[in-house]
Every structure is written in C-alpha cells, then in structure tokens.
Amino acid sequence: MSEFTVYPAIDIRNGKCVRLIQGDYEKETIYGHSPLEMASRFAEEGASWIHLVDLDGAREGKKVNGGHVISIADKLDVKVQVGGGIRTEKDVYDYLSQGVERVILGSSAVSNTEFVKKMLKAYGGHIAIGLDARDGFVSTEGWLETSSVRAEELGRELANEGAEVFIFTDIATDGMLSGPNINSTVELARATGKQVIASGGVSSLADLEALASRASEGVSGAIVGKALYTNQFTVAEALERVAAK
C-alpha cells in the first residue's frame, strides 16, 4: 500500500492561529491557542507532520512569523513544512538550517521560476511546490492574483527540474468544508508523475478515506485545517481512518 500522510494545518497571522475562507483576509476566524500550543496538541494526537502557513508572509512577500515556525520545529518531535512569504535563498536556508523539514514555494513558482529551479537543485526533496489553483489556473500572492498558467503545465515543467512533492489547493474548496477536489489532485499527480498532497475542502473522515484510496495514483497526503478546528474529527481519528485503508 502507498503511504498516505495527514498534515494538520496551522495558519499564522499576527502571531495567532487563524483560518480564512477561500484565502479571504476579511473572512478570518481566530482560535485561542498559540501556534505552538496547537502544534503540541496535534503532535500529542499522533501527527508526524505539521503544515504551517505564514499568512502575513504570503501577503507581504517576506517572512513575518518565522519565529513561531522555528519554535515549533525546535520544540516538538514532528516534521514541519512551511509556506508563505519565502522569496529568497536566505529564507529557504534559514528555515531548513533551523529544523524545518520542507519549505513550500508557491507564488515564486510562477513569478520567479528560475529561483525555484535553483532551489530544487540545491535542496531537492526539502522543497515542495505549492500550486494553488482557481478554475485550473495557478493563483499567486496569497491568492490575490490569478495567473494565465495552468497548474498541470507548471507542475510538469517543475517535475522535470527535480520537484518531488507538490501541494495542490483548489481555492474554491478551501475553508468551505465542501469536500476536496479529488479529480484535479489526481490529474496533477498523473501529469507530474510525482507525489501530490491535497489541500482544501476536507470536511469528514470519508473525504480523507477517499483521498487515501488514491494513494497508489500519487495522492500522498492531505492537509486538514478547518475540519479539525470545528471538531468534525480529531487528528487521532484521521490517522486511524487512513491507516485502515
């Protein structure tokens, strides 16, 4: 059986855990725990990875909440992947040299493809490519801009440059608890021949099970956010369900 990983998500804005709906900064819910407390809770429930997003960084195009990210990577026995505002080689190096396992390059994949190719060459599997799509086209700058580049085309190009892991978000489903876009996730995995982590829309254990059932086709994991925060299920329940696949 192909391995399938559950990635509990923590979105950080102004140093707090928040959730946005469809990436809209006006539609924000703040949760009471600090990012470290929330990550600790997820780790205690059995998470092996934590997915972190520096929302301020994504919007401003530079690292803003890096201290919180490093703290989680340093203090907890989990692997951390982080995205948001990572635009320079120093940003990448700083995270990877301080315990972060994987850095996600998103907007740069469109706006500065040469930089991404250089990072793939230097850091290989420690780089994940974040492809966030609206109607099949890659969206950038914290989802504020939509490009004319198709997700599958960019994915194929970067896979040829050494990308091993992609994170695919269908913006229409993000934070909506409406179910993930499984078909588009599988299509990206087929187009690239690489691992694709699904993000956005997971609302139930059944959604996770449906994604995990496609692991042999390249769907290697799912990022879960709002469903955990609204108590649809726990990390422990999620891990139990996908382990049964």
Curated annotation (Swiss-Prot):
InterPro entries: Aldolase_TIM (IPR013785), His_biosynth (IPR006062), HisA_bact_arch (IPR006063), Isoase_HisA-like (IPR044524), Isoase_HisA-like_bact (IPR023016), RibuloseP-bd_barrel (IPR011060). It is an enzyme of class 5 (isomerase). Belongs to the HisA/HisF family. It is found in: Cytoplasm. Pathway: Amino-acid biosynthesis; L-histidine biosynthesis; L-histidine from 5-phospho-alpha-D-ribose 1-diphosphate: step 4/9. It catalyses: 1-(5-phospho-beta-D-ribosyl)-5-[(5-phospho-beta-D-ribosylamino)methylideneamino]imidazole-4-carboxamide = 5-[(5-phospho-1-deoxy-D-ribulos-1-ylimino)methylamino]-1-(5-phospho-beta-D-ribosyl)imidazole-4-carboxamide. It holds the Pfam family His_biosynth. Its EC number is 5.3.1.16. GO terms for biological process: L-histidine biosynthetic process; L-tryptophan biosynthetic process. Its main location: cytoplasm. The active site is at residues 11, 132. The gene is hisA. This is 1-(5-phosphoribosyl)-5-[(5-phosphoribosylamino)methylideneamino] imidazole-4-carboxamide isomerase. GO terms for cellular component: cytoplasm. It comes from Bacillus licheniformis (strain ATCC 14580 / DSM 13 / JCM 2505 / CCUG 7422 / NBRC 12200 / NCIMB 9375 / NCTC 10341 / NRRL NRS-1264 / Gibson 46). The keyword Cell cycle does not apply. Keywords: Amino-acid biosynthesis, Cytoplasm, Histidine biosynthesis, Isomerase. GO terms for molecular function: 1-(5-phosphoribosyl)-5-[(5-phosphoribosylamino)methylideneamino]imidazole-4-carboxamide isomerase activity. The lineage of its organism: Bacteria, Bacillati, Bacillota, Bacilli, Bacillales. NCBIfam families: 1-(5-phosphoribosyl)-5-[(5-phosphoribosylamino)methylideneamino]imidazole-4-carboxamide isomerase.
